[in-house]
């Protein structure tokens, strides 16, 4: 009898709505909010960009957030188990999402290590008067990828990389409430306070108004350019942690009576509010350095790694109390990256734990230690930066966008949206209906355009001048391998104690 009707293990839960919201915001607010949004806004019409950005948030970001919440909460499992309980044919999407998180986790840790190192460097001034030369030549000791992959390890990179892995795995081993929720409940308020102080400080720097003018002056002509709208949808999609298993996993830890849509609205608008705050702080600081150097903002404005590790050290060198500015900026970057990194690894831990039914401590070790070693081998060397660049590009477009597009098409084609909508409406304050379903369908089209247009561009032009063998192996090869491994994992049997179906009226 015990084998015919196995009793499922009791799933961990967040203590309440506040704990979940802070953890979800912690996942969503990451590197992209601080170093991607400001420059994306500046490049795509300034103040005018806010219009497509808000439309993207309301028609894609929040609807997809609701969808992820419904899948995870209704089916009470990590991504693979939730999709398996949704439909046996959908299980592969969950494993595909898990594999995307494996790749992201491998390289996200190294950027987290960089940010932590630069928090310390803010006080020592290690980068001197030439931050670019220091970052490329002394910190990364960057080699030429055209000469092949290097296995020459860089101590300044590997030591903080390993340290960040140990911190994250320590948090994850403590569980959902005692680990993830507690850390998020501390780091997120601290992050907001630190960044508010940074913004206020930046606004009082000479030339701050010049930077804000550059950021917010609208170029309305940009709104007729389709690439601007795609940039808006891309920013929302990549910054909200939607479509690749994180929010499915976190929602599965909610108690059965939870306000899903209300929480989703809070998370969605909190994430966007932080992005706007980041834009103000970053461009006020860029206005200062442009004024100090007698340049235009366009000459100093950068995004991504260039903003964080080239532009900001220069700003810190020239700003009054620059050490404080550096601590606030790189400390914020570290905290934001850490909570996002934890959420990425949790997707993998949850998936494996559901599959083989062993303790959280054991599965954290089984997942974490091999990933840490691979992370060090790939990104702790002199060719770590080009490896990171290619991994990030391909896993975003041909991992995240690809699996989101495929899973949405499957859900819509199999007429499952109504089922998820009903689940959302059972416990939520904000009800969904036809408009929500329409947004999901239309978002599928946007994702298809993003996927195929970017695929055609990279296929015909290559990527950033990297050698074909490198892009084909670690770009296209990696992307294809994610789906291949996902198909293999979906064929493996589940542990007999794993309950693969749910009560359609009550859930697990």
UniProtKB/Swiss-Prot annotation:
It is found in: Cell membrane. GO terms for biological process: sodium ion transmembrane transport. It is a multi-pass membrane protein. Pfam families: SNF (PF00209). One of its GO terms (molecular function) is symporter activity. Disulfide bonds: none annotated. GO terms for cellular component: plasma membrane. The keyword Membrane applies. It comes from the Bacteria. Keywords: Cell membrane, Membrane, Symport, Transmembrane, Transmembrane helix, Transport. InterPro entries: Na/ntran_symport (IPR000175), SNS_sf (IPR037272). The chain crosses the membrane at residues 19-39, 47-67, 92-112, 153-173, 186-206, 228-248, 272-292, 325-345, 365-385, 394-414, 432-452, 469-489. Belongs to the sodium:neurotransmitter symporter (SNF) (TC 2.A.22) family. Putative sodium-dependent transporter. This is Uncharacterized sodium-dependent transporter HI_0736. It comes from Haemophilus influenzae (strain ATCC 51907 / DSM 11121 / KW20 / Rd). The lineage of its organism: Bacteria, Pseudomonadati, Pseudomonadota, Gammaproteobacteria, Pasteurellales.
